[in-house]
Swiss-Prot record:
It comes from Pongo abelii. Residues 917-939 have a biased composition (Polar residues). The lineage of its organism: Eukaryota, Metazoa, Chordata, Craniata, Vertebrata. It is found in: Cytoplasm; Cytoplasmic vesicle, COPII-coated vesicle membrane; Endoplasmic reticulum membrane. Monoubiquitinated by the BCR(KLHL12) E3 ubiquitin ligase complex, leading to regulate the size of COPII coats. Gene3D superfamilies: 1.25.40.1030, Functional domain of the splicing factor Prp18, YVTN repeat-like/Quinoprotein amine dehydrogenase. GO terms for biological process: COPII-coated vesicle cargo loading; endoplasmic reticulum organization; protein transport. Residues 161-471 are annotated as: Interaction with SEC13. It is a peripheral membrane protein. Component of the coat protein complex II (COPII) which promotes the formation of transport vesicles from the endoplasmic reticulum (ER). The coat has two main functions, the physical deformation of the endoplasmic reticulum membrane into vesicles and the selection of cargo molecules. Residues 800-999 are annotated as: Interaction with PDCD6. It holds the Pfam family TPR_Sec16. This is Protein transport protein Sec31A.
Amino acid sequence: MKLKEVDRTAMQAWSPAQNHPIYLATGTSAQQLDATFSTNASLEIFELDLSDPSLDMKSCATFSSSHRYHKLIWGPYKMDSKGDVSGVLIAGGENGNIILYDPSKIIAGDKEVVIAQNDKHTGPVRALDVNIFQTNLVASGANESEIYIWDLNNFATPMTPGAKTQPPEDISCIAWNRQVQHILASASPSGRATVWDLRKNEPIIKVSDHSNRMHCSGLAWHPDVATQMVLASEDDRLPVIQMWDLRFASSPLRVLENHARGILAIAWSMADPELLLSCGKDAKILCSNPNTGEVLYELPTNTQWCFDIQWCPRNPAVLSAASFDGRISVYSIMGGSTDGLRQKQVDKLSSSFGNLDPFGTGQPLPPLQIPQQTAQHSIVLPLKKPPKWIRRPVGASFSFGGKLVTFENVRMPSHQGAEQQQQQHHVFISQVVTEKEFLSRSDQLQQAVQSQGFISYCQKKIDASQTEFEKNVWSFLKVNFEDDSRGKYLELLGYRKEDLGKKIALALNKVDGANVALKDSDQVAQSDGEESPAAEEQLLGEHIKEEKEESEFLPSSGGTFNISVSGDIDGLITQALLTGNFESAVDLCLHDNRMADAIILAIAGGQELLARTQKKYFAKSQSKITRLITAVVMKNWKEIVESCDLKNWREALAAVLTYAKPDEFSALCDLLGTRLENEGDSLLQTQACLCYICAGNVEKLVACWTKAQDGSHPLSLQDLIEKVVILRKAVQLTQAMDTSTVGVLLAAKMSQYANLLAAQGSIAAALAFLPDNTNQPNIMQLRDRLCRAQGEPVAGHESPKIPYEEQQLPKGRPGPVAGHHQMPRVQTQQYYPHGENPPPPGFIMHGNVNPNAAGQLPTSPGHMHTQVPPYPQPQRPQNGWNDPPALNRVPKKKKMPENFMPPVPITSPIMNPLGDPQSQMLQQQPSAPVPLSSQSSFPQPHLPGGQHFHGIQQPLGQTGMPPSFSKPNIEGAPGAPIGNTFQHVQSLPTKKITKKPIPDEHLILKTTFEDLIQRCLSSATDPQTKRKLDDASKRLEFLYDKLREQTLSPTITSGLHNIARSIETRNYSEGLTMHTHIVSTSNFSETSAFMPVLKVVLTQANKLGV
């Protein structure tokens, strides 16, 4: 699309890439005249302002010159990275002079803008170029084969690259090499190009076209490959661009024939080596890919020829073209619309003729508005492929599972004269781990669950606890896996039975501290864990003494006592007891406040009386522990849990642990935990977790922990999940409860935990921790993603079906079985379609013996004669990598009907039967000999394509020869009678020849090439073509061997993969182009064994259209 234009008949030069803003210098051309036939000359500098929508370029400065110019370049001499200095303008004049201008002075309007000039050349200077490595070096070319190298630091004395070429001729083009700073190339209209080495001061190679019709109008070096260059021809009879490689200078590497008439100028983009501009006498400006010859873009131009074309160094999408109609146009290869250009033409027309009626009526002229109304939008398409500078050099994207996918387009470093730089497209998949401690703790938890080592895991957590509360929680969790869990809970609450016994004993003053210590079995135990005999005797004596002291307080059984029946309380109690009225006796005792007597009598009166008495007692008693005693006696623990002061939550929990029944234990602990959780005190809220642990209530533990702890950090969530997992395992082991069903809150936490694990790359662990029995959409979606990330089938989804149906190969038809001493039939002059002549009797086919196939198929008895037809071959056999070459000794016959059965040849008395294809597939697995069979199977006349036949060696049966002998695979010649003889041939030890497998990334090459050959063979009718394809199939083994050994360079393997992709898309022309590229850019000795035959295969495939 056109961006700007300047109405000048001039040579052009862009400002260097370091300069900003972008300038375009123009110098009056010495080859053309403008429409005014003016003889004045000038230098002008225009600014490129792409923000301005108009087509006009702003003129910054004009310098009137006395010279007209054949060539103009703008070099970056003495410029820094900031572009403060504008470099130097170098102009080639028509009188052999070279003038150096200061652009900054021209822009500033100074009069003295010439830095230096020299007229050493003879004739006009048509060729100029600046060395990109040493910007002070400028090469120039003129008539009489004159080439000078100018040093801008010492402009007075130039040097020559060597002796002048003979015969003398004009120098039309000159260019410095883009990779090697001392290499220079020049070209002349005669079609000859010369490459100079400034270090040797002589030409090193000359390139010319053999047709002698190549009139060089353009020369350009490859931006990346030091040995490649292009030459353009101005001759209308040969309007081509030739791409040469100096390593193969006998003929052009590639010829671009996109122009219809001679080419006037070319320019190779430094930003993208796949963009080559060319303009010719056919009034076309084409942007082509020199590597493929494809035209990527055609600029919309007028019918005028362009004599100069250049890329903008700073903006790689912009180019300029100078045409013979006196206009310099600036274009963009990124496409756009030409509506602005059309509108400008309409505006010019209107301004020239006016838009009012010339007769003064003041009415607008309708015809001038009609083109504007009927005009359609014209869109110019951009390049067919994205240019290199807009391709992302690097990129990154996060994916599920903590994967970081990054790519980078790495250009391999080039060397002098080395291969073409290859753009290596690398994609890296990295695992990003940000929470290493989180993963470590998660791994420890998984190991504890898998090994069932919960006690040791809890102990480690206790030892590592930094707070007392954390230590208590893990201690409570540990108790779940130990014996006497309730007793251990009491100990954790501070109620140790041994310590309580000591306190009670001291309170009763029965024994001193020393005796208490003796009564404690733990204290008197010896170091080996057993009690000493002395300790046992002492304890026994103490027990007898206590019983004796207690018996002294009982009333004496001897003597008499008085039974009073008076009218006082005692007498009434006595009368009630004598009559068996326990209820009245108890009432009298309660009335007299004799509580102990009432309880004793109530016990004798039965449970019902005792219960009523206890209630009356508790109603009258007002001590501090009455409610506790009431709960103990009445077993009303819910009252204690609901009514106790929460400061005594430990005591309430201890009472529940001591007395509660298993069926009510969990509910009471939950009730106490709920009271603590609902209390405003944060300390009590955290203690509720201990109650929920005792109850085994995972859901409430999660809810309570979430309220009390900060769950935003991954380690905080890890703390919770560790407790939840251990508690669930404890409930599962101790209470035999189903823990698979989870609540909403727990499922959310487990899902969050699984997400964190997946984000750290632990997909399997995340899948293991994810709840199973839940229908929550987010969890089901996460499970689906985890299964897919791990490559496992997703529950509820069918596996993708195989797009083809597996077919079982048919079993071989049964062969004839000969009886004992049965003589074979003699058949003469037999032939077999597609078969081979068997060798004469006694000839051992070593190539058909597979040492690993022993014992795979049954064999015939030793005294039976078996008749076996030769192995049928639908086509020339394709040898496997470990098979010897097949020998075709019989000329091919016409194809027989499918139902044609070949006659059975005469064979030796002992013959190896051929097994069915399924048995042949098992020949790589050694096994024990199979028992003898009286039948053998023959294969069907056809086997699937690509399956190779391997000879089979079998052990003999009991009726055959001894085990130390082996049967040779012997076939008789057709028609030759064979006697009833045996040949005992001892098998020689053979060593299996093995090759490395082809790497998986290159296996597609073998599959693609072999499949292409098979398709060609099935379509080819010419015997000569089939022989070529057969030979190609064998010689491609050299390629496969190199792939196995991985001795090919990355450039070659990458090119082979490109060829394989072109074969898959049936684009054989592209494959041949890539083949030429590989051959021209690689070492010949590395590819000579297989690349010629690969070209044969591609050519035949293209010819056959398979």
